[in-house]
Amino acid sequence: MFLRSKIDKAARTHLLAIGAIWLIIGLCFANSLNNDFHFDDEHSLIGNPHIRGLDKAAQFFVDPQLFSRNEGSGMYRPLVLLSYALNFIVAGYDKTVFHVTNLIIHAVVASLLYALLVNFSGSSRHSAFVTVAFAIHPLSSEPVNYVSSRSES
């Protein structure tokens, strides 16, 4: 019984830490949810006919030219293209949905960082602090604010 309560307490601590991390990320980046598309979003997203459905999903994994409508701007990022296509299927070109997806990806990455740090350090408090510092650092804002930077989370 003692071991179970100790495990439950540790799980509760980690869930609270991850919940707090997600809340802080949400509060810090909520103002970006209505940002417009800009810069590379035009050629890799808005003007890219390949992400308007899943009919070319298998080709995302073999043809880097599908990344952009511009000749020679291809990059091998199949999971990014797949996520764009899924976003498009769900909500068309609703910029808020694209930004929410980026925010969720960023929060998931932060959660994974927290788990990794706890595994290495054993300290949930220090791990949470470092994770929040990473998650809200200005250098980490690009993948949340800029849809085309989704792959940099």
Regions of interest found by a model, annotated:
Residues 1-153:
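Polytopic membrane enzymes that build or remodel cell-surface glycoconjugates and lipids
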